[in-house]
Design a protein with these regions (language model features):
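Hydrophobic beta-sheet segments that form the core/acyl-binding groove
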Residues: 46-82
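Hydrophobic beta-strand-centered segment that forms part of the acyl-chain substrate-binding groove
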Residues: 25-60, 94
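Residue-level signal for secondary-structure boundary sites
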Residues: 1, 71, 85, 97-99
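C-terminal output/interaction extensions
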Residues: 92-145
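Catalytic strand-loop segment that frames the active site of acyl-thioester-processing enzymes
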Residues: 1-12, 137-151
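A structural microfeature
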Residues: 87-89
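Short alpha-helical scaffold segments that flank and stabilize functional sites
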Residues: 23-28, 80-82
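Compact, glycine-rich, soluble single-domain proteins
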Residues: 8-14, 18-26
Length: 151
C-alpha cells in the first residue's frame, strides 16, 4: 500500500514514476512495429530524482531511443514538472521473439487499441519528424470487428 510506503508523507512514489516512464517507453517501442512486437521492460539501468512530485502535479514524460541492437533497446527518459527536470531514467527493454513466445499475445489487439485510444496516445505521440503516430491498420480492423462496425 502506498500509505505505508512513507507514513505521514504525501508524495508520488518514485517507483510509480519509473512505471509510468517504462509504460511510455514500451509504447514507443511497440509503435515501431505497429504494436506487433512483444516488448517488455528488462532492466532499470539508472534513475535520478531531482525533487519529489506531489498530489495534483502533472508530470510529462519524454522518452528517446538511445541504442537498439539484437540484445535489446535502451531508452533515455525524463520526467518534467512544467519546465523543471524532475527525473532522469535509463531503461532497457527486450522483445520476446524466440519460439517459446510464438503463441503468446501480451494484449488482445482490439482491447489494446481501445485502451491506448482512451489514453490519447494517438493524439500526443509523434514520430521523430514531428508527425502524429497513426493507428495501425490491424488494430483498426480488430477494433471494428469488436465493435461490429461496417459489417
Amino acid at each position: 500500500m502506498v500509505d505505508e510506503y512513507a507514513p505521514g508523507r504525501t508524495f508520488f512514489p518514485s517507483s510509480l514514476i519509473i512505471e509510468g516512464i517504462a509504460q511510455t517507453g514500451g509504447l514507443l517501442l511497440g509503435q515501431l512495429s505497429d504494436f506487433t512486437d512483444r516488448v517488455v521492460l528488462a532492466k532499470v539501468n539508472s534513475c535520478k530524482f531531482h525533487f519529489e512530485a506531489y498530489p495534483g502535479d502533472t508530470l510529462n514524460y519524454h522518452v528517446k531511443i538511445t541504442n537498439r541492437d539484437g540484445i535489446g533497446t535502451m531508452v533515455s527518459a525524463t520526467s518534467h514538472l512544467g519546465d523543471r527536470l524532475q527525473a532522469e531514467v535509463e531503461l532497457m527493454f527486450a522483445t520476446l521473439d524466440d519460439e517459446r513466445f510464438n503463441d503468446v499475445e501480451l494484449f488482445e489487439p482490439a482491447q489494446f487499441c481501445r485502451m491506448i485510444r482512451l489514453l490519447r496516445i494517438f493524439e500526443v505521440g509523434v514520430n521523430p519528424d514531428g508527425t502524429p503516430i497513426k493507428v495501425p491498420q490491424h488494430m483498426v480492423a480488430a477494433e471494428k470487428s469488436l465493435l461490429h462496425i461496417g459489417f
